[in-house]
């Protein structure tokens, strides 16, 4: 008796369905976690900092995998450039007459990053995790004189950042909102001044009470 052609497909579907179901549930849970962590910028970057420290300690302890470290540093630099660069290059807008601003209000547009902060964080964190896993495979430990890679990366970093800074000054944009640190500084200063005033007021209230008590003692005498 020959098996029906559809029986094998049904069996494969039955076997694969639990795995596919688990994959879908894991994907939803992970995406839910990412969505909930989006507002917590400081906590997210602290996690990335911990991952970076663990990776650096791993490379330092085994004293190897310098090519992987060079690739990781170059990739992080590329992400940083995307994070600091505008989504639309002003140089290309200047060459296109159709994209020129019609009125003066269009000249001051909000800075939109080519790579948003959340995507920058996610890609950087994933890069550190992947690089850490790669350090457990000995065939990836290519022998190389690491000071050459370090010098080459420093030169690459200097040239890239110099070009980016010149581009910022030329087209008059700044990738950070300076108003938020100023508001935070004002809040901290006002909080300290309010605390000092309250403390001074408490001290002033204590002085009359002490003087009144001394006058009462004199009257009793």
UniProtKB/Swiss-Prot annotation:
The chain crosses the membrane at residues 41-58, 64-84, 128-148, 149-169. It is a multi-pass membrane protein. It is found in: Membrane. Its main location: membrane. Residues 209-221 have a biased composition (Polar residues). It comes from the Eukaryota. The keyword Transmembrane helix applies. Residues 200-221 are annotated as: Disordered. Coiled coil: none annotated. GO terms for cellular component: cytoplasm; intracellular membrane-bounded organelle; membrane. Signal peptide: none annotated. Keywords: Membrane, Transmembrane, Transmembrane helix. Pfam families: Rer1. PANTHER family: PROTEIN RER1 (PTHR10743:SF0). Belongs to the RER1 family. Involved in the retrieval of endoplasmic reticulum membrane proteins from the early Golgi compartment. This is Protein RER1D. It comes from Arabidopsis thaliana. The lineage of its organism: Eukaryota, Viridiplantae, Streptophyta, Embryophyta, Tracheophyta.
């Amino acid at each position: 008796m020959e098996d029906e052609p559809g029986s094998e497909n049904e069996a494969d579907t039955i076997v694969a369905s639990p795995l596919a179901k688990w994959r879908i549930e894991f994907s939803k849970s992970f995406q839910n976690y990412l969505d909930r962590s989006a507002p917590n910028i400081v906590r997210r970057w602290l996690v990335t900092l911990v991952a970076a420290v663990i990776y650096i300690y791993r490379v330092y302890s085994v004293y190897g995998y310098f090519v992987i470290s060079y690739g990781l540093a170059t990739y992080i630099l590329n992400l940083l450039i995307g994070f600091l660069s505008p989504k639309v290059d002003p140089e290309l807008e200047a060459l296109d007459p159709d994209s020129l601003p019609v009125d003066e209000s269009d000249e001051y547009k909000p800075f939109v990053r080519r790579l948003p902060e959340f995507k920058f964080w996610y890609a950087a964190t994933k890069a550190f995790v992947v690089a850490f896993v790669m350090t457990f495979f000995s065939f990836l430990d290519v022998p190389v004189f690491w000071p050459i890679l370090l010098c080459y990366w420093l030169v690459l970093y200097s040239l890239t950042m110099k070009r980016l800074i010149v581009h910022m000054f030329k087209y008059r944009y700044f990738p950070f909102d300076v108003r938020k640190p100023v508001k935070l500084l004002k809040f901290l200063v006002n909080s300290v001044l309010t605390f000092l005033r309250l403390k001074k007021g408490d001290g002033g209230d204590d002085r009359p009470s002490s003087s009144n008590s001394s006058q009462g003692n004199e009257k009793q005498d």
